[in-house]
Amino acid sequence: MAYFGCGPCGGSAGYNNCYNNGYGNGYGSNHCRDGFGACQNNVSGRNREVYYEKDNCFNANNNNFYGGRENDSCGGWNAGCNNGNCGGWNSGGCGLPFYGGGCGIGGGCGIGGGCGPIGDCGPIGGGCGPIGGGCGPVGGWRKGYKGGYGGAPSSKLCRGLGYKKRN
């Protein structure tokens, strides 16, 4: 039984009947990527004191938007998933991590790769990712409930006149 694609490979004819199936698509490979990231952080503070009453109000708002799209078309000799034995000697685009596949662990789009979950564009350590990213709530521009941005206190309701409790 032959497997076409990046699925499990084994079986017949040594090369799994998928030998160099990308050759007919030429030697070229295409890569396309577009991304967008935006950060908005607002911090406001007010401190007023009237006779015996103190009124402190702090508010911190953080809005994040990040998105990215990645497209790869691999049709070259060493690029496709089925070159040689799938996951074998010339495994490229989606091969096993041991062969440096583009979508494998450590590959361009794999775990630890530039656009993988732990990488430049990923949610962990990415420029706008939620964990460790420049715009994420954990690291960089943080949300107000963990101390706020720039050391501002956490958000709380403003106390107006009529509340006689002193801070």
UniProtKB/Swiss-Prot annotation:
Primary localization: virion
CC per GO annotation: virion component
Subcellular localization(s) per the UniProt record: Virion
Keywords, comma-separated and alphabetical: Virion
The organism's place on the tree of life at top rank: Viruses
Name of the protein described by the UniProt record: Uncharacterized protein L550
Protein's organism: Acanthamoeba polyphaga mimivirus (APMV)
